[in-house]
Amino acid sequence: KGQKRPSRRSSNNGEDNIITNGSGIAVADGQCMLIVEQGRVVEVCAEPGEFTFDASTEPSVFTGNFGDSLAETFQTVAKRFTYGGDTGKDQRVYYINTKELGEILYGTATPIPFRVVVSEERGYKLSVNLRCNGSFTCRICDPLLFYTNVCSNVSTQYDASEIAPRLKSELMNALQPALATLSALSLIHISESTR
């Protein structure tokens, strides 16, 4: 979650979870910035640089039909009075890392049974227990989908260590049926003497 950063010269420290019109939001290389308003993603930016927030969703007497605009503006002002002068909106900035995440280690908790055919003509079959250990990397390709399905409404930050167990579990759930399929193919063991 992004944090406000008022300048030293500013007399206004700003409010948490309120983004004012024209605010500059820095987006670094390898990041995707999401602006969430009232729990809904309203802006997405994945280009490095400064993103300028445009709050043109607020009604103004200077746009549209004067009578309608004036009525909408008074409704907004009345709503602000009920919220103590604030906008009454919860606005948040979230940054999602789009770079490749480092090595995530995995291993099988229990051995996986695997059958190997040693000699088909003699009917020798061998069952072995396999253990798998290794590492993998991952990358968030669709930050919007990741936000909505995995980490929405995080109070401070969602670390890679929080998603690693889920990724490991999904890898193991995919690996075991794949090994079972290989085992069903009756793989033939090739010894050094038969090569």
What spans do the regions from the language model cover?
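Short, solvent-exposed coil/turn linker segments
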Residues: 97, 159, 183-187
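Interfacial loop/beta elements and low-complexity acidic/Ser/Thr-rich segments
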Residues: 1-133, 137-151, 155
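Short amphipathic alpha-helical patches
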Residues: 57-58, 159, 194
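Residue-level detector of conserved catalytic or cofactor/ligand-binding positions
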Residues: 186-194
